[in-house]
């Protein structure tokens, strides 16, 4: 299993078309847990490599469970999820103790923290669904640790040293060190479970939209070389997974037409019906799954939320044979010419939100997109049309004190 890549789109695609496979995968995860004491991260040839970051098995399990795909032992799965989250790997001991990973002690500290925070939200969601409030509270608090590495001055997630100071000098264009196969630009927007909280850290919707525009429009060049960084538009990198959700974030700030325009550009420029027609490598299905979902007019920004964010379909007609035996037909009028959504209807009922739920899709029927060659700047602009986000109120950093740290002269009284 490659869990760092396909949890983003491939696994959410399978929950639509092959729930048996999803159950089989999760039961295999639990077999691995029985044998090794931990859920898989990135196993190869029956051995765990620990190559990538996060513990994204929990995303696959929680996403399935919350969608009603449950042919596995949920109690055992939750136990495995918690144990795996507390295993000491790539700075997770610091993450649990302090709420951040010291960048002067561990490499990839920012990327690890951001992905751990999302994974902890997945555990919290599943625990809440199972009625385990204490577990929910523990992990939902941990899921907010992303706040602790956001620098309001630069508006980037940055490496923080053990003494609490930012890693300096800071170059958001530099490859590596605090980031996994990326720069600070590509991890600038990775809080899929709490986009609204992230927006508030940026200063509000206007500032967040400006930052989204910047990643696609900047002419700044990456400093350093990494083979995984391919398919650039500005500092957006389609050839590697951390960027894959970014184009869809305009749906959270009332400018969905920008998602529609950019997702179409990515579909047209990053995929070609030729040998080596995919930018980057296939990454165990993720690159293709992004294309499939996006060409259907859907994307799973936050697996575990039970929502798919909307964009313009690529084809006039797509027929999806759902796992429950029903059929979903997606229709769009002249999508090669018309790239903007004016109206969305499911079985004749208008959908005014910028997302659609899993249950609605699995009901089957006809999902019709009415399109135009001009952006509709009135649809999907209201706050209530935005997709799921955990935070609805203002957020603050989580403080910590360690008696072993000597940061002050004299004495410290707590």
Where are these regions (language model features)?
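Active-site core of glycosidic bond-cleaving carbohydrate-active enzymes
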Residues: 2-8, 16, 58, 68-329, ...
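Active-site alpha-helical elements of protease catalytic centers
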Residues: 12
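Active-site-surrounding "flap" and adjacent substrate/cofactor-binding loops of secreted or lumenal enzymes
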Residues: 19-44, 220-223
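Mobile, glycine-rich extracellular loop/lid and propeptide segments
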Residues: 22-27, 32, 47-53, 64, ...
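Short, intrinsically disordered/low-complexity patches at protein termini
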Residues: 35, 46-47, 325, 392
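Beta-rich accessory regions
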Residues: 272, 302-305, 309-411
